[in-house]
């Protein structure tokens, strides 16, 4: 899990600092850049990972994510055609498309090789300049409808991969020969161990170049990208999957922006992600089911991890369970329709029987003996009178039915005055009455509320508590943890259903510790002392004994702890590191106030919810700021 993140970050560092530096200085600057990004010193395991990249390089396979972002929204989805793009975004998209072929080429051939990156990068650019197919106008290609509806974005990406594949033989041959030349040119002054490492590294480059010349490798690169495009298109069809996927893309763009010191780029290229081609292709061949592949891609992408056999099986199980639930819902819907149809048929039968009975009674009345002329006249007049009276009564009856219908309409609106919807309620919007937004109701577990207290009291509670992972922590550690856990003001955002749905994604439910649990996740930025950390705001919930939703976990998880797996794994994963939740006191937070002198200001708009934590002795001093960002528009 950690490796993909570190490779990704090393790529960013290379972008910032370039590769034309000595190894020792390169290593030092890389570590310093990472520590600035993380706002802390690197751990031993992280330093070891950076050093392993320097020692072994990176030859991992990659795929391109077929999505174009502009600021905080998706402007081109996998299946988008040019005509689908908003007019005000088309100039931006066209600029991205012009750069896309170069990005595709780099994703196909780029490798990270310490002390050799200069000539390899020059070679990548040189081959692209020499061999790019006839300087194709990719924008015109994407815009061209050819009398039809035009090509999808994934079709454009796949076409570029196929066209660029023709350049792999030339690049592979030059790369292999270049590595061989450098082996022969190694200076005699090198120590034996240094020479051995250099030869081993260049030998790997040489073998990689030869492999690119093979038809099998060329097919693998193109096929893996085709599967990735199909998977992303499938992900886009399910709203919950699409939200998670775009949130993770947005999170990575935010990280790159922080890495650049907050500098906005004129154009953000689509992301390149490390993904095992062999596992991707073999899963597709084995299951022949794009639902399984899409679930696998979604899982490893949002959890930022390498594909493992367990991930494949998890994807298979998730798809099977989803289909089982869909079949159950379809069966219930069919059953409901059948019952409704039977009920309608029964009602229709009763109506027919009633009409036939009325006809028989009417027929009997006409069969009575006729009276004399006078009697007939009187009968006729009486009949007319009765007819008038009858029609008059009928009109009255109709009027009553209409009145009842109007009354029914009023009654249908009455429940809106205060309607319970699961765990939500709303009030009817009346004339001159301010609309009250629908609310969620939660209880907050004491393990969340403890972080409101001072560090010393928190430490005493944790040392005496039942959660082993929190025992014997230093005061310094507790203070650091308080910064990311003492964010109970987020509950204000959670309670407002409309806002909550705009900022938070709900993950699937899972069972742990005899309780049904689930999460809500949002992108966020924590700022303190001029340093910014990108991460996820996590809310962990379970069902209480009374059926209420109880918040047992609330924190801001910085990206580096999520990706290194140091605290509970991915925010989107269907698991957590809380083994047991004791039946302790929970609060609905009604009337909650911090101690006197502490001030916390909250502001919000459609795009962000901002919490400023201030110094209790000097409220003009902002200690830290948590900004929660809305789910990107798709």
Swiss-Prot record:
> Where does the secretion signal sit in this chain?
none
Tell me which domain of life the UniProt entry assigns to the organism this sequence originates from. Eukaryota
Indicate, by first and last residue, each region the UniProt record lists as having compositional bias (Acidic residues).
408-417
| Listed Pfam families | DUF1609, DUF3654
> Where is there biased composition of kind Basic and acidic residues?
354-365, 397-407
**Region (Disordered): which ranges?**
354-438
Which family does the entry's similarity section mention?
Belongs to the UPF0329 family.
* Full protein name: UPF0329 protein ECU07_1850/ECU10_0050
| Organism annotation | Encephalitozoon cuniculi (strain GB-M1)
């Amino acid at each position: 899990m950690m490796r993909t993140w570190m490779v990704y970050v090393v790529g960013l560092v290379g972008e910032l600092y370039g590769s034309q530096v000595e190894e020792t200085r390169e290593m030092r600057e890389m570590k310093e850049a990472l520590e600035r990004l993380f706002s802390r010193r690197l751990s031993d395991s992280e330093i070891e990972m950076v050093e392993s990249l320097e020692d072994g390089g990176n030859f991992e396979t990659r795929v391109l994510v077929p999505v174009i972002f502009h600021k905080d929204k998706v402007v081109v989805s996998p299946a988008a055609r040019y005509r689908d793009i908003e007019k005000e975004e088309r100039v931006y998209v066209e600029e991205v498309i012009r750069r896309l072929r170069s990005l595709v080429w780099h994703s196909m051939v780029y490798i990270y090789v310490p002390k050799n990156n200069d000539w390899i990068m020059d070679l990548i650019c040189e081959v692209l300049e020499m061999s790019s197919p006839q300087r194709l106008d990719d924008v015109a290609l994407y815009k061209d409808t050819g009398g039809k509806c035009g090509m999808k974005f994934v079709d454009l990406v796949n076409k570029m991969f196929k066209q660029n594949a023709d350049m792999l033989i030339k690049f592979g041959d030059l790369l292999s020969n270049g590595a061989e030349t450098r082996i022969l040119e190694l200076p005699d002054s090198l120590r034996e161990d240094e020479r051995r490492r250099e030869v081993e590294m260049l030998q790997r480059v040489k073998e990689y170049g030869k492999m690119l010349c093979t038809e099998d490798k060329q097919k693998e690169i193109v096929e893996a990208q085709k599967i990735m495009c199909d998977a992303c298109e499938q992900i886009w069809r399910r709203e919950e999957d699409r939200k998670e996927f775009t949130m993770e893309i947005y999170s990575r763009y935010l990280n790159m922006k922080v890495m650049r010191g907050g500098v906005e780029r004129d154009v953000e290229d689509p992301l390149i992600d490390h993904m095992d081609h062999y596992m991707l292709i073999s899963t597709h061949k084995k299951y022949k089911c794009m639902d399984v592949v899409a679930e696998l891609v979604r899982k490893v992408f949002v959890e930022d991890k390498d594909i493992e056999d367990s991930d494949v099986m998890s994807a298979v199980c998730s798809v099977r369970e989803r289909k089982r639930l869909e079949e159950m819902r379809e069966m219930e819907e069919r059953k409901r329709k059948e019952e409704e149809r039977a009920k309608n048929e029964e009602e229709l039968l009763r109506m027919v029987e009633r009409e036939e009975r009325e006809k028989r009674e009417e027929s009997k009345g006409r069969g009575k003996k006729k009276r004399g002329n006078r009697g007939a006249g009187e009968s006729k007049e009486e009949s007319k009178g009765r007819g008038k009276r009858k029609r008059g009564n009928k009109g009255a009856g109709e009027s009553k039915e209409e009145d009842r219908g109007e009354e029914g309409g009023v009654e249908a609106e009455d429940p809106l005055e205060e309607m319970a919807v699961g765990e939500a309620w709303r009030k009817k919007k009346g004339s001159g009455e301010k609309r009250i937004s629908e609310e969620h109701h939660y209880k907050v577990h004491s393990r969340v509320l403890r972080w409101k207290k001072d560090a010393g009291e928190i430490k005493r509670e944790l040392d005496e508590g039942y959660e082993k992972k929190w025992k014997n922590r230093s005061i310094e550690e507790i203070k650091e943890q308080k910064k990311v856990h003492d964010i109970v003001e987020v509950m204000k955002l959670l309670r407002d259903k409309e806002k909550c749905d705009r900022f938070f994604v709900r993950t699937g439910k899972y069972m742990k510790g005899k309780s049904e649990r689930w999460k809500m996740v949002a992108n966020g930025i924590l700022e303190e002392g001029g340093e910014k950390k990108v991460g996820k705001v996590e809310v962990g919930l379970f069902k209480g004994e009374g059926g209420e939703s109880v918040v047992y976990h609330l924190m801001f998880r910085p990206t580096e702890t999520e990706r290194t797996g140091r605290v509970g794994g991915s925010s989107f994963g269907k698991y957590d590191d809380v083994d047991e939740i004791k039946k302790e006191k929970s609060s609905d937070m009604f009337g909650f106030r911090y101690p006197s002198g502490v001030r916390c200001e909250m502001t919000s708009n459609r795009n962000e919810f901002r919490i400023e934590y201030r110094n209790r002795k000097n409220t003009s001093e902002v200690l830290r700021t948590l900004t929660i960002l809305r789910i990107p528009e798709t």
